[in-house]
Amino acid sequence: MNNSINIASSAMLVELSIRSWTARKLDKRVSSEVDTAKGTKTRVINANKNLLAGTGVLDTIVKYAANARAWHNAQTLPWSDNGSRLLPVSNFVNYKEQLNVLEKNYNALVTKFLTAYPDLVSAAAFQLGDLFDRSEYPDASKIATKFSFNYSFFPVPTAGNFIIEIGRAHV
């Protein structure tokens, strides 16, 4: 009698992808000015500016996404380098319920950010001073495409996977 655990029936694979807009922009003019002022070779310095410096609203989304990823990693086990992680079937219902809450809250934060975005751009003009360039601020509808909260579930392969095959060899 074979009492070995069948990983394909006791676990599944899950992939989680959370994207957020960085609101960072390379300022080539400032980079060049610093290179010239410091006597460096061309393109030694890259000056990146935070387009929404001082607002903190986007930081809240980025931190929330990081916490969601950390929670996901705590609930799952590493499986592959492409982002797939192993989720025990026994944890699926709780995992999915919490994931739905995380997604709902993330989307609410994004909606709040997009609603405030025009005011945040106006505030950035004061924060950035001479570095402010209105053309670097896309329309809110374009910014909305920079945010996403996606996940997929897949069965654990039953053959053709090194981990599965090595397990069979030692049974």
Task: Describe each PLM feature range.
Residues 1-139:
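Leu/Val/Ala/Ile-rich N-terminal alpha-helices, chiefly Sec-type signal peptides and the beginnings
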Residues 138-164:
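Acidic, low-complexity proline/glycine-rich segments
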Residues 169-171:
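Conserved small/polar residues in nucleotide/adenosyl-binding loops
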